[in-house]
């Protein structure tokens, strides 16, 4: 901070993360060492193919951080319309230049360096006058500086030599210094008035529009993260040069967010916002649109005339400004969502909603249960449209993905078992705060992490989601003050990144469980085949054993017929029509196939085999013959069918 120029407009400081990076590598390597399933996944999945590079990068990054001071700063300025950024950090031990040269050589792409490493003498010889595609690291005994323009780096180096900097005494610098009080691990700040003045279009109409929104008076944006473990906390502030006005004032003052009493304690994501009077917001938005000659509201009169209602008076005027949206399930076929809105006049709003359904020729069913009247209909798309239900309960409008979703919300509210009453939610409140706020964002971090893991290993996503029931809440609270909008959140020791680490560590156990389930299913299926073969032989003694799985299964007519060609002893999931002696059939992560030794339609022996689809679905192949013994072999999935003699050489399953 003391060495930066007064013209600095953006400031980002990050604490030294060398040790955390080292710990991540250590933990992951331990898991790789102990878990064969994880090693196979790491070596075969799409993401895992990049794994060794990621691991090596983290290791190098932790080594790099050993050379640096307590924090690294990214400072931004602007000359004309071109932003300029420099990365600056103190150095604390010798050898950094050699380390960087070696690392950049390793990262070089086909001989093209990704960055140039120089000392002061080397930098002086660079004659470039424009930003370069290849950034420069200037390594000095006291500082390391990185940028894409040699002239800017030289200018900053001169400032370091003179130990001169004006930012500390400037108002923006003083605001940044204030954020450091009490300690911080990550700090980001922007002088918005400087940025606005530098990026002004010169178009009076555009500049006036920005001013009219209220955001043209934005002063500073500051965000900081402090503490570690159970003491983690973040704070943000968007301040203004005076009282908030225009769109910047639409966020209301803190209030008790009572709509949270309708939110399920098992929700994955919930967002609540407290607006000022929605009807007044409509008026201000319309006025702004008209002043800029925007046609945003041009279609509203036609819409109102056709549907015979007033958007302002009949809808927005009946809402109290408090809105909550929640998502309870991420499964595409079981998507469950709800929206809860504060209502001023329930009778007026119900009349309006009924009129809109009638005007749009939407058929709605009406159900009454437990004192709650629920209306259900289909969204756009007719019978295939999304199911939507709504009910007005105790002064709140509940809209959800079907009757069940709405009924659950009403029950949660009346039973007092809502998210707002749960221990993990209450523990997420910032110190000294209640749930009086202008807005709130909530997430279940492990459930959110399952979405990321699910992209890599879809069969694990459901397990991770189920494991999120006892996870720590992650919430962000927003407060609308007269001349600022503030944000506070408590991580309680586990944020999304932490959840992903936990999930990654849990993968071996989840994989073991999945593999065990697949293998147990495969063994059970082979036992079913053996039993079916015995039954087939006694039913059709002239034929002996069935020649393939399809013969043991149902025929084209389904489960009605029982013939020697289709004995209907096994269901189609294992013995479909395509499951011939030359084809593999798939069930529960395993491929199945059966052949037989036959002469003139009489089969005297058979071999049935089950082998994993991939190395991620099992580690053992299984087989069985007419002796009824299940045998196994550890190794890669089979490509070819095995003979009866080869099967009998495998290890018998105990």
Stretches found by the model and what they are:
Residues 637-640:
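A short acidic/small-residue loop/turn micro-motif
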Residues 1-130, 169-221, 235-333, 347-363, ...:
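Structural boundary/hinge residues at secondary-structure and domain interfaces
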Residues 33, 105-108, 158-161, 358, ...:
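Sec-exported extracytoplasmic/periplasmic mature domains
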Residues 73-77, 132-142, 323-329, 386-395, ...:
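Short, surface-exposed beta-strand/loop micro-motifs that present aromatic residues
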Residues 130-203, 383-464:
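A conserved glycine-rich beta-strand in the N-terminal activation segment of trypsin-fold
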Residues 528-619, 624-627, 634, 646-654:
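Extracellular/periplasmic head regions of type IV pilus-like filament subunits
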Residues 491-537:
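Amphipathic alpha-helical segments typified by the pilin-like N-terminal helix
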Residues 318-319, 368-385:
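Flexible, glycine/threonine-enriched loop-and-boundary segments that flank and lead into catalytic domains
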């Amino acid at each position: 901070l003391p060495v930066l120029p007064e013209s600095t407009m953006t400031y980002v400081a990050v604490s030294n993360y060398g040790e955390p990076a080292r710990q991540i590598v250590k933990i992951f390597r331990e898991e790789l060492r102990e878990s064969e399933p994880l090693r196979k996944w790491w070596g075969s999945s799409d993401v895992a193919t990049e794994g060794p590079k990621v691991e090596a990068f983290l290791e190098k990054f932790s080594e790099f951080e050993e050379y640096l001071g307590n924090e690294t700063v990214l400072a931004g300025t602007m000359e004309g319309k071109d932003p300029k950024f420099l990365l600056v950090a103190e150095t604390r031990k010798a050898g950094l230049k050699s380390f960087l040269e070696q690392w950049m050589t390793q990262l070089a792409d086909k001989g093209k360096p990704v960055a140039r490493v120089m000392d002061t003498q080397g930098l002086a010889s660079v004659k470039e006058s424009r930003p370069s595609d290849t950034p420069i690291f200037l390594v000095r005994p006291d500082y390391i500086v990185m940028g894409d323009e040699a002239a800017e780096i030289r200018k900053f180096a001169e400032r370091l030599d003179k130990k001169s900097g004006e930012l500390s005494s400037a108002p923006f610098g003083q605001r940044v210094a204030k954020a450091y009080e009490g300690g911080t691990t990550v700090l980001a700040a922007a002088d918005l008035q400087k940025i606005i003045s530098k990026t002004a279009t010169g178009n009076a109409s555009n500049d006036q529009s920005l001013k009219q929104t209220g955001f043209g008076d934005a002063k500073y944006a500051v965000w900081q993260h402090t503490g570690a473990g159970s003491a983690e906390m973040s704070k943000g502030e968007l301040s203004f040069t005076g009282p908030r006005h225009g769109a910047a004032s639409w966020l209301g003052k803190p209030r008790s967010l009572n709509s949270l009493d309708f939110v399920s304690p098992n929700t994955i994501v919930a967002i609540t916002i407290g607006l000022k009077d929605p009807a007044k917001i409509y008026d201000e938005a319309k006025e702004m649109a008209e002043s800029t000659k925007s046609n945003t509201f041009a279609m509203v009169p036609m819409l109102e005339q056709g549907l015979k209602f007033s958007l302002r008076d009949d809808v927005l005027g009946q809402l109290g400004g408090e809105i909550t949206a929640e998502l309870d399930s991420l499964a595409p076929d079981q998507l469950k969502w709800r929206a809860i809105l504060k209502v001023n006049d329930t009778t007026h709003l119900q009349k309006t909603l009924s009129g809109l359904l009638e005007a749009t020729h939407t058929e709605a069913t009406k159900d009454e249960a437990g004192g709650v009247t629920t209306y259900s209909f289909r969204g756009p798309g007719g019978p295939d449209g999304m199911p939507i239900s709504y009910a007005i309960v105790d002064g709140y409008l509940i809209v959800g993905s079907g009757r069940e979703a709405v009924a659950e919300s009403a029950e949660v509210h009346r039973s007092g078992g809502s998210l707002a009453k749960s221990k993990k939610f209450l523990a997420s409140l910032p110190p000294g705060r209640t749930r009086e706020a202008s807005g709130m964002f909530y997430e279940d971090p492990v459930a959110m992490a399952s979405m990321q893991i699910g992209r890599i290993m879809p069969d694990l996503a459901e397990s991770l989601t189920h494991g999120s029931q006892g996870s720590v809440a992650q919430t962000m609270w927003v407060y609308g003050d007269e001349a600022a909008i503030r944000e506070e959140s408590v991580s309680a020791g586990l944020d999304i990144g932490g959840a992903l680490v936990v999930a990654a560590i849990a993968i071996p156990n989840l994989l073991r469980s999945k593999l065990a389930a697949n293998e147990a299913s495969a063994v059970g299926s082979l036992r079913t085949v053996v039993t079916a073969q015995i039954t087939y032989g006694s039913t059709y003694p002239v034929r002996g054993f069935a020649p393939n799985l399809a013969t043991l299964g149902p025929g084209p007519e389904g489960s009605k017929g029982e013939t020697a060609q289709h004995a209907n002893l096994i269901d189609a999931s294992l013995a479909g029509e395509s499951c011939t002696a030359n084809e593999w059939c798939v069930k529960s992560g395993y491929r199945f196939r059966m052949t037989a030794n036959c002469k003139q339609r009489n089969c005297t022996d058979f071999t049935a085999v089950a082998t994993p689809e991939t190395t991620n679905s099992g580690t053992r192949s299984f087989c069985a013959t007419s002796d009824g013994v299940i045998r196994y072999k550890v190794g890669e999935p089979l490509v070819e069918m095995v003979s009866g003699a080869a099967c009998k050489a495998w290890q018998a399953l105990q």
